Protein backbone atom coordinates (compact mmCIF):
# COMPACT_ATOMS: atom_id res chain seq x y z
CA UNK A 1 0.00 0.00 0.00
CA UNK A 2 1.44 3.44 -0.90
CA UNK A 3 2.18 6.12 1.65
CA UNK A 4 -0.54 8.63 2.38
CA UNK A 5 0.16 12.11 1.02
CA UNK A 6 0.18 15.07 3.38
CA UNK A 7 -2.30 17.80 2.51
CA UNK A 8 0.06 20.71 1.81
CA UNK A 9 -2.41 23.46 2.70
CA UNK A 10 -3.02 21.83 6.10
CA UNK A 11 0.72 21.38 6.66
CA UNK A 12 1.20 25.14 6.29
CA UNK A 13 -1.64 25.97 8.70
CA UNK A 14 -1.27 23.45 11.54
CA UNK A 15 1.55 22.20 13.75
CA UNK A 16 1.52 19.27 16.16
CA UNK A 17 3.22 19.75 19.53
CA UNK A 18 5.18 17.08 21.41
CA UNK A 19 2.19 16.41 23.65
CA UNK A 20 -0.06 15.89 20.62
CA UNK A 21 -1.96 19.19 20.63
CA UNK A 22 -2.55 20.86 17.27
CA UNK A 23 -1.70 24.57 17.11
CA UNK A 24 -3.28 26.97 14.64
CA UNK A 25 -3.32 30.69 13.88
CA UNK A 26 -6.39 32.87 14.31
CA UNK A 27 -8.41 34.09 11.34
CA UNK A 28 -9.73 37.64 10.71
CA UNK A 29 -6.47 39.47 11.28
CA UNK A 30 -5.20 40.39 7.81
CA UNK A 31 -8.10 42.32 6.32
CA UNK A 32 -10.30 45.18 7.55
CA UNK A 33 -8.17 45.65 10.65
CA UNK A 34 -8.91 49.35 10.94
CA UNK A 35 -12.34 48.62 12.38
CA UNK A 36 -11.03 46.18 14.96
CA UNK A 37 -9.85 47.28 18.37
CA UNK A 38 -6.22 47.03 19.37
CA UNK A 39 -6.77 44.43 22.07
CA UNK A 40 -8.75 42.26 19.62
CA UNK A 41 -5.89 42.35 17.10
CA UNK A 42 -3.40 41.54 19.86
CA UNK A 43 -5.48 38.53 20.90
CA UNK A 44 -5.70 37.35 17.28
CA UNK A 45 -1.88 37.27 17.06
CA UNK A 46 -1.72 34.49 19.64
CA UNK A 47 -1.81 30.82 18.69
CA UNK A 48 -4.85 28.68 19.45
CA UNK A 49 -5.43 24.97 19.97
CA UNK A 50 -7.65 23.06 17.52
CA UNK A 51 -10.83 21.78 19.17
CA UNK A 52 -11.17 18.11 20.01
CA UNK A 53 -14.04 17.79 17.50
CA UNK A 54 -11.71 18.73 14.62
CA UNK A 55 -8.54 17.06 15.91
CA UNK A 56 -8.95 13.72 14.09
CA UNK A 57 -9.80 15.44 10.81
CA UNK A 58 -6.69 17.62 10.95
CA UNK A 59 -4.48 14.68 11.91
CA UNK A 60 -5.76 12.75 8.90
CA UNK A 61 -4.95 15.70 6.61
CA UNK A 62 -1.45 15.87 8.07
CA UNK A 63 -0.96 12.15 7.47
CA UNK A 64 -0.43 11.40 11.16
CA UNK A 65 -3.38 9.05 11.57
Curated annotation (Swiss-Prot):
Annotated keywords: Ribonucleoprotein, Ribosomal protein
GO biological process entries: translation
InterPro entries: Ribosomal_bL35 (IPR001706), Ribosomal_bL35-like (IPR021137), Ribosomal_bL35_CS (IPR018265), Ribosomal_bL35_sf (IPR037229)
Pfam families per UniProt: Ribosomal_L35p
Keyword Zinc-finger: no
Any one GO molecular-function label of the UniProt entry: structural constituent of ribosome
GO cellular component: cytosolic large ribosomal subunit
NCBIfam families: rpmI_bact
PANTHER family on file: 54S RIBOSOMAL PROTEIN BL35M, LARGE RIBOSOMAL SUBUNIT PROTEIN BL35M
Record-stated family: Belongs to the bacterial ribosomal protein bL35 family.
Protein name: Large ribosomal subunit protein bL35
Amino acid sequence: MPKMKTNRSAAKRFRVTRKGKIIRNHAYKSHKTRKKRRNVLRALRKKDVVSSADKNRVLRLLGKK
